[in-house]
């Protein structure tokens, strides 16, 4: 993994100045773009340096810290948001690994998306992006054999599309939480019931 200090120095001495010098200062520079496990440490090194921080619009992260058997480290997102409230936090990649066509209807697929989205939204993220919206019936194509699930699976031979439950889970969020929405307080009366709420620019309230 690219260490924090070289990334910081590259941004403040090379990439950031080059973008500004060539008229691209309006581009939104997203740093890190890896898993939640090292998110606080990486953000601290990058954002506590005022020169580097002046070029950084946001910090991106993924959900693959669970590869080692750990639970999702949602509190790391909250910690960074509290320490650097003016920096945008973005979930930039996530997918269900180890594709198995016989499991494309498993509820665990959509539930993983919902669990991650609810926790990360409540911890202050700005945006959420899936990795692959569409893959084929092998979970590819992929040049290194990293075959994964996707919200939509295309059966090339049959020329059909299968919309997994992940597609509808993600759609539930994107349908009701509009661009420019602001998160508002929400709570549930059960410890295992997750919820989040937003007020949209038109004044409507989305409670998921």
Language-model-derived ranges and their functions:
Residues 71, 139-141, 208:
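Extended hydrophobic-aromatic, low-complexity segments
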